[in-house]
UniProtKB/Swiss-Prot annotation:
Annotated protein name in UniProt: Chaperonin GroEL 1
Organism encoding this protein: Renibacterium salmoninarum (strain ATCC 33209 / DSM 20767 / JCM 11484 / NBRC 15589 / NCIMB 2235)
Record lineage: Bacteria, Bacillati, Actinomycetota, Actinomycetes, Micrococcales
Domain of life: Bacteria
Record's subunit section: Forms a cylinder of 14 subunits composed of two heptameric rings stacked back-to-back. Interacts with the co-chaperonin GroES.
PROSITE patterns: CHAPERONINS_CPN60
The entry's keywords: ATP-binding, Chaperone, Cytoplasm, Isomerase, Nucleotide-binding
GO molecular function terms attached to this record: ATP binding; ATP-dependent protein folding chaperone; isomerase activity; unfolded protein binding
Enzyme class: isomerase
Binding-site residues, ATP: 29-32, 86-90, 413, 477-479, 493
Catalytic activity: ATP + H2O + a folded polypeptide = ADP + phosphate + an unfolded polypeptide
Compartment(s): Cytoplasm
Length: 542
């Protein structure tokens, strides 16, 4: 495909135009008085959202240079969303301000590389001040306040705080669509996986259609169990102990399954068989997790263990097991706390090292099942459009709350950046174009507060000047229009969100300023179709 090439100022200005179009569409959503954006979908109802990354993803520009500029800023929003779960609009607004100021200085003759170095040093200094000023989240109310701001709904904030309180910061909080109105919170004790009983004959509670085993042994087998002779030895040993048995295997086939069912129906031996969760290597890992949690071992020929020779000390134990048609829950496994902690550390290391979003999500689920718990927030709404929007807001707020617990909180409303900047620039000693680069950051960190003020119908310059003169931690509460102590008023941001927004915006701004050439695909003109669409090329069949 033919290419078109732009050089120097033309290249940078083309990229900036794309950035500005995208940023202008996103920044109207910033702050408590931000507006919504309607996104048309090829199929189904349109989506209404105030989430920066969702809006950014939908924007495709026609001009090739503008398109590249917009794609670069999408990366800012996407990266911030991945790391912190929020702050995508703030990151976009900061990127726009940094690029605007930076390009003005490049056009005036400043050295782009020195500007970039100055920006990086200033951002590092501001980040250091942000982290130093962060306050640890100590109460449920502080988590609720943070989540409420992200979701723009106090009820959602309170529910997320309750969920986090129950499952801990390592726990998984999932959001599901509900057919009812309102919000519901469902908590899961212990480890749950998505496989139920193989046969309904295992049910012990006919009304609830579930099998409940108290203080059972747990047999974990990596292969299929097809021959009843392989099982007889271990079954006899378990029966002698008068305990029940949960069998987790790739499958339990006809003969072996029939033996278990007959013993259960006759009341001789209570057991339940379920298929192992997952597939391939992921199944192996999950079985190993269950073994560590319950203090058992996976019976597998790979490690030289066979079902035929299995002994009771290879079995896991738990206080209780509940099995339904679709899922199995193991409550209070009898595993060694030290071994569980080691497994948790291993999974954490894998999360750090993986590049795949899907793998990361699955690893986090495994981590939660071992270290925390699982909470499900069920959201309902009157229409499908509203439901999608609400679900998305809750998902963002969950990640926002987790970020707050992780690194602490700072005053919200764009104030933390300005006040961290005041301290950071007092100590920063730079010269020449590096000092100019630092000054670009000094100007740009006002941008989020200015945009919040504009969206609230206030004069941005006046608001920024007023906030600069206020005590540390005080600022504009844009929801009420009052200048007050923001942390006390529950207006806060996770420092991870604010920090990530600034760092990612600066990273992209540096790329913009040091770009000298842009190579893009040449737009193809739409060639009109040839007249006469029949098989004889317009000859009417003759």
């Amino acid at each position: 495909m033919a290419k078109i090439i732009a050089f120097d100022e033309e290249a940078r200005r083309g990229l900036e135009r794309g950035l500005n179009i995208l940023a202008d569409a996103v920044k109207v959503t910033l702050g408590p008085r931000g507006r919504n954006v309607v996104l048309e979908k090829k199929w189904g109802a349109p989506t209404i959202t105030n989430d920066g990354v969702s809006i950014a993803k939908e924007i495709e520009l026609e001009d090739p240079y503008e398109k590249i500029g917009a794609e670069l800023v999408k990366e800012v929003a996407k990266k911030t969303d991945e790391v912190a779960g929020d702050g995508t609009t703030t990151a976009t607004v900061l990127a726009q301000a940094l690029v605007r100021e930076g390009l003005r200085n490049v056009a005036a003759g400043a050295d782009p590389l020195s500007l970039k170095r100055g920006i990086e040093k200033a951002v590092a200094a501001v980040t250091e001040q942000l982290l130093a000023s962060a306050k640890e989240v100590e109460t449920k109310e502080e988590i609720a306040a943070t989540a409420s701001i992200s979701a723009a709904d106090t009820q959602i904030g309170a529910l997320i705080a309750e969920a986090l309180d129950k499952v801990g910061k390592e726990g998984v909080i999932t959001v599901e669509e509900s057919n009812t109105f309102g919000l519901e919170l469902e908590l899961t004790e212990g480890m749950r996986f998505d496989k139920g009983y193989i046969s309904q004959y295992f049910v012990t509670d006919a009304e609830r259609q579930e099998t409940v085993l108290e203080d059972p042994y747990i047999l974990i087998v990596s292969s299929k169990i097809s021959n009843v002779k392989d099982m007889v030895g271990i079954l006899e040993k378990v029966m002698q102990s008068s305990k029940s048995l949960l069998i987790i295997a790739e499958d339990v086939e006809t003969e072996a399954l029939a033996t278990l069912i007959v013993n259960k129906v006759r009341g001789l031996f209570k057991s339940v068989a379920v298929k192992a969760p997952g597939f391939g290597d992921r199944r192996k890992a999950q079985l190993a997790d269950i073994a560590i949690l319950t203090g058992g071992q996976v019976i597998s020929e790979e490690v030289g263990l066979s079902l035929e020779n299995a002994t009771v000390d290879l079995l896991g134990q738990a206080r209780k097991v509940v099995v339904t048609k679709d899922e199995t829950t193991i409550v209070e496994g009898a595993g060694d706390a030290e071994q569980i902690a080691g497994r948790v550390a291993q999974i954490r290391a894998e999360i750090e090292n993986t590049d795949s979003d899907y793998d990361r999500e699955k690893l986090q689920e495994r981590l939660a099942k071992l270290a925390g718990g699982v909470a499900v927030i069920k959201a309902g709404s009157a229409t499908e459009v509203e439901l999608k929007e609400r679900k998305h807001r809750i998902e963002d707020a969950v990640r926002n709350a987790k970020a707050a617990v992780e690194e602490g909180i700072v005053p919200g409303g764009g104030v933390a950046l300005i006040q961290a900047g005041v301290k950071a620039f007092e100590t920063l000693q730079l010269e020449g174009d590096e000092a100019t680069g630092a000054n670009i950051v000094k100007v740009a960190i006002d941008a989020p507060l200015k945009q919040i003020a504009i969206n609230a119908g206030l004069e941005p310059g006046v608001v920024v000047d007023k906030v600069r003169g206020l005590p540390v931690g005080h600022g504009l509460n844009a929801a009420t229009g009052v200048y007050e102590d923001l942390l006390a008023a529950g207006v806060n941001d996770p420092v991870k969100v604010t920090r990530s927004a600034l760092q990612n915006a600066a990273s992209i701004a540096g790329l913009f300023l040091t770009t000298e050439v842009v190579v893009a695909d040449k737009p193809q003109k739409n060639v009109p179709a040839a007249p006469g669409g029949d098989e004889m090329g317009g000859m009417g069949g003759f």
